[in-house]
């Protein structure tokens, strides 16, 4: 194995120097080290730095000196001892020295331990802010994006010029790392994602496997089916917050392929994901494929297919609720469309007690499509588009207009999506 030789050298060759360096700083066991912020340590730091400097000058010509001071630099990065690290760097420590087990450099370790001041020191000494490790190909920015506790390091790396859109060999950027590392329950990388987006992260980034910024959200929504209700609520809240951020920075939730389209997924399960779907439509998301139109997939077709596949009976409350939510979704589609785009061969064959209502709903859409939209409808759509992004209803209510006109501008089903979630 490639690192066995490194182990042997640590133990028999430069480990004594590493131990001496740690000892000069009053560090006996880094794994069990007490807080370095305690007054007794801070008060004696000056004298410890002098002892360290004398030790390094005395050992400067000893065998494996550079390996020893470079390995000690990894310990300083882990503990956040910037003054000691600065001394080691001025006495020959190698910034590119890799941990023999993880192959991480001091910069990677500083990020993993959330030591932003150490990150800045290392970069100012010449560390490559975009360097990737040899095993996982993770950049410092990738590592910083994966945990909410590393937000200070993420901010510092961006301030120091880290490439926010650099991708690994699989095409994965820091934004995709932040999304993939979030589970919506224990790990919420919302602020990391916000910071990356504000720093210019590309919302169109796609891996070689086809993963997009919506892949994680679609996966997490699937995890809510049949799971713990409390966890499902947390996941839904996280998915809403992240979707809102992504849309605000230009992400398109209605692009092909269908299995990577958040709008398509929400339409397929509109009863379950109703609040998020309502938010998408009120935010201006296309209800058809945004690349190929209704010929690829159509929200109208998906909604009616779902209605017609639900047998139901007169007393079936779930079917009545399904119909109510379908009417809401269809109303939002109409409200935000200058001209309806119904799919070709848009025929339906409903069954059950609500078949007549479904047929009437279908007929009304056919009627709307067959006539030119009235001017008042075009004005309504134009004003609502102008007031985006979401929440449009709040902005409509703030307009200096008569209440009757405000009522017309509002969708019949506008409401607080955030409260629903």
From Swiss-Prot:
**What processing steps or modifications follow its translation?**
Ubiquitinated by RNF41; leading to proteasomal degradation.
Q: Name one Pfam family in it.
A: Ank_2
- The record's disulfide annotation reads none
Q: Where in the cell is it found?
A: Cytoplasm
Keywords for this protein: ANK repeat, Cytoplasm, Repeat, Ubl conjugation, Ubl conjugation pathway
Q: At which residues are the ANK repeats?
A: 67-97, 102-131, 136-166, 170-205, 226-255, 260-289
Q: Which CDD domains match?
A: SOCS_ASB6
Answer yes or no on keyword Protein transport.
no
What biological processes does GO assign it?
intracellular signal transduction; protein ubiquitination
| Pathway noted in the entry | Protein modification; protein ubiquitination
Specify whether Repeat is a keyword of the entry: yes
Q: Which GO terms describe its cellular component?
A: cytosol
Domain SOCS box residues, every copy: 360-415
**What is recorded about the protein's domains?**
The SOCS box domain mediates the interaction with the Elongin BC complex, an adapter module in different E3 ubiquitin-protein ligase complexes.
- Cited function: Probable substrate-recognition component of a SCF-like ECS (Elongin-Cullin-SOCS-box protein) E3 ubiquitin-protein ligase complex which mediates the ubiquitination and subsequent proteasomal degradation of target proteins. May play a role in the regulation of cell proliferation and autophagy by promoting the ubiquitination and degradation of SQSTM1.
Family, as annotated: Belongs to the ankyrin SOCS box (ASB) family.
Subunit note: Binds APS. Identified in a complex with ELOB and ELOC. Interacts with CUL5 and RNF7. Interacts with SQSTM1.
Q: What is this protein called?
A: Ankyrin repeat and SOCS box protein 6
Q: Tell me what organism the protein belongs to.
A: Homo sapiens
Supply the source organism's classification: Eukaryota, Metazoa, Chordata, Craniata, Vertebrata
């Amino acid at each position: 194995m490639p690192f066995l030789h490194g182990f042997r050298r640590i133990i028999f060759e430069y480990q004594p120097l590493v131990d001496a360096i740690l000892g000069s700083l009053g560090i006996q066991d880094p794994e069990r080290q007490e807080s370095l912020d305690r007054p007794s340590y801070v008060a004696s730091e000056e004298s410890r730095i002098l002892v360290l400097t004398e030790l390094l000058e005395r050992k400067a010509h000893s065998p494996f000196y550079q390996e020893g001071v470079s390995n000690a630099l990894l310990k300083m990065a882990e503990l956040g001892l910037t003054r000691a690290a600065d001394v080691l760097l001025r006495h020959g420590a190698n910034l590119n020295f890799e941990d023999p087990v993880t192959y991480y450099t001091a910069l990677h370790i500083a990020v993993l331990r959330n030591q932003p001041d150490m990150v800045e020191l290392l970069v100012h000494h010449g560390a490559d802010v975009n360097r990737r490790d040899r095993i996982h190909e993770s950049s410092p920015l990738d590592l910083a994006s994966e945990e909410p506790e590393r937000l200070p390091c993420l901010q510092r790396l961006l301030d120091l010029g880290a490439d926010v859109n650099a991708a690994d060999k699989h095409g994965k950027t820091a934004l995709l790392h932040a999304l993939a590392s979030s589970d919506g329950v224990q790990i919420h990388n919302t602020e990391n994602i916000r910071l990356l987006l504000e720093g210019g992260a590309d919302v169109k980034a796609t891996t070689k496997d086809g993963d997009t910024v919506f892949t994680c959200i679609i996966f997490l929504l699937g995890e809510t089916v049949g799971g713990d209700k409390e966890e499902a609520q947390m996941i839904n809240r996280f998915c809403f917050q992240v979707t809102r951020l992504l849309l605000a920075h230009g992400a398109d939730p209605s692009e092909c392929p269908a299995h990577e389209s958040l709008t398509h997924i929400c339409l397929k399960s509109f009863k379950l994901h109703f609040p998020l779907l309502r938010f998408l439509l009120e935010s201006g998301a296309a209800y058809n494929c945004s690349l190929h139109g209704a010929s690829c997939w159509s929200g109208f077709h998906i909604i009616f297919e779902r209605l017609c596949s639900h047998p139901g009976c007169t007393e079936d409350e779930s079917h009545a609720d399904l119909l109510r939510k379908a009417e809401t979704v269809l109303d939002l589609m109409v409200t935000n469309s200058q001209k309806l785009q119904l799919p070709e061969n848009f025929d339906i064959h409903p069954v059950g007690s609500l078949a007549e209502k479904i047929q009437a709903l279908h007929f009304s859409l056919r009627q709307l499509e067959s006539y030119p939209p009235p001017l008042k409808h075009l004005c309504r759509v134009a004003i609502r588009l102008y007031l985006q992004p979401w929440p449009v209803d709040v902005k409509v209510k703030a307009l200096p207009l008569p209440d009757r006109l405000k009522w017309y501008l509002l969708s019949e089903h506008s409401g607080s999506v955030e409260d629903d979630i």
